[in-house]
């Protein structure tokens, strides 16, 4: 595998424990190395207040960068902040913690919950994990020399199992890919590894060539490993146009095959299966208490459909039925997708349906689907085939994979 690259260099003249704030509200905090090999730094109330007063707004949020210069021999960095920094209910601040192991962006409302209400101090630890700490030999081989980091949080000295679906934390790990990986950078991704060495893909994990980092967003802390996964299937010969999207989306853990070596690209995708993939692709979350009458609680798609219903993107047939096992038509797939992208991902629905004039079967599109389909065509997410949009046709698994691959690359950052 590749190696981790450089991060925040130490500057000459840094005094351990010294903290500076510049005119833009950015903090440089030189750490002190303790006896355990942890580089420790603390930001006090006064420093934080000065930084927030000077900080500039971007995207409606005040951003404070906290750079911790690298210190030789450090196996972890621990930064402590006043708890007030991360318990804002407004969510209009963020703190970018920059170390040579990882850059971690903490939203100011990540702890806006009961547990942290009386807290005084919050400490974030970023630890570089040695692969030898993983007992599973196969997993060790798969990760190789790629970086593994552990993120953890303590509140007033006590370990805190942070988990907040409403306030994702953004992570960027410096990484230098191998030649093989650079030839297929979309297959560089991220795995979450739990205490039992069970692996869960982090679907939004990807390599950013511009910054030379592997980036991902998470809603809980644990171990996270950079990995290179090239999943393929034995039945893709007839769908060359869909091979790359299928392989990339499968490698990221977003889509699965119908068997260990089969994808069944020409099979129709059901309404339930498509909803699962859409929710997983976009990483959408919601607490819900009710579901459609025909979605059973033990169904594998129960959670995804419940989330889609709660978020107002799966509307059913008006009789509180979703018809989960029915194939999804192309126009219903496009309508559902346009609705979610408009409501949650910043796409603006367009009323200009002239863009559909290029399709000879435009007249087959149902009234309710016109705006959504026109918007997706305008955005280049749907291109049609042979001057047809085929709104009434069922959607194949290959078509769904290609569409979601385009959505992923346009909207998942």
Describe the residue ranges of each PLM region.
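Proteolytic processing hotspots in large secreted/extracellular or virion-associated proteins
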Residues: 34-194
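A generic structural signal for beta-strand entry/edge sites
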Residues: 61-63, 76, 92-94, 168, ...
């Amino acid at each position: 595998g590749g190696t981790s690259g450089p991060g925040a260099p130490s500057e000459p003249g840094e005094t351990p424990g010294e903290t500076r704030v510049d005119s833009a509200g950015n903090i440089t905090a030189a750490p002190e190395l303790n006896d355990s090999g942890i580089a420790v730094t603390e930001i006090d109330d006064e420093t934080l207040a000065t930084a927030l007063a000077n900080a500039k707004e971007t995207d409606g949020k005040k951003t404070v960068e906290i750079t911790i210069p690298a210190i030789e021999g450090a196996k972890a960095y621990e930064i402590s902040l006043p708890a007030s920094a991360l318990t804002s209910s407004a969510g209009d601040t963020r703190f970018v913690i920059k170390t040579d192991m990882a850059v971690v962006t903490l939203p100011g409302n990540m702890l806006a919950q009961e547990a942290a209400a009386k807290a005084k101090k919050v400490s974030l630890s970023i630890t570089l994990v040695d692969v030898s700490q993983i007992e599973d030999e196969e997993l060790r081989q798969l990760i190789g020399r790629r970086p593994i980091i552990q993120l953890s949080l303590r509140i007033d000295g006590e370990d805190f199992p942070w988990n907040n679906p409403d306030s994702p934390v953004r992570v960027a790990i410096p990484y230098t890919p191998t030649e093989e990986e650079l030839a297929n950078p979309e297959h560089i991704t991220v795995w979450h590894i739990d205490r039992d060495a069970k692996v869960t893909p982090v679907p939004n994990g990807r390599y950013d060539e511009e910054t030379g980092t592997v980036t991902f967003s998470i809603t809980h802390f644990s171990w996270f490993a950079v990995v290179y996964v090239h999943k393929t299937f034995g039945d893709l010969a007839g769908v060359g146009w869909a091979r790359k999207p299928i392989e990339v989306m499968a490698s990221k853990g977003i889509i699965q095959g119908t068997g260990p070596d089969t994808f069944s690209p020409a099979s129709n995708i059901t309404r339930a299966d498509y909803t699962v993939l859409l929710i997983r692709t976009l990483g959408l979350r919601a607490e819900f208490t009710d579901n459609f009458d025909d979605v059973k609680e033990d169904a594998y798609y129960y959670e995804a459909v419940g989330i889609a219903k709660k978020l107002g993107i799966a509307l059913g047939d008006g009789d509180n039925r979703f018809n989960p096992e029915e194939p999804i038509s192309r126009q219903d797939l496009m309508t559902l997708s346009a609705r979610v992208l408009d409501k949650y991902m910043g796409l603006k629905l367009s009323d200009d349906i002239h863009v559909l004039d290029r399709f000879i079967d435009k007249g087959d599109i149902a009234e309710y689907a016109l705006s959504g389909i026109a918007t997706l065509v305008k955005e280049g997410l749907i291109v049609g085939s042979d001057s047809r949009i085929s709104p009434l046709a069922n959607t194949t698994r290959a078509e769904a994979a290609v569409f979601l691959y385009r959505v992923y690359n346009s909207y998942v950052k």
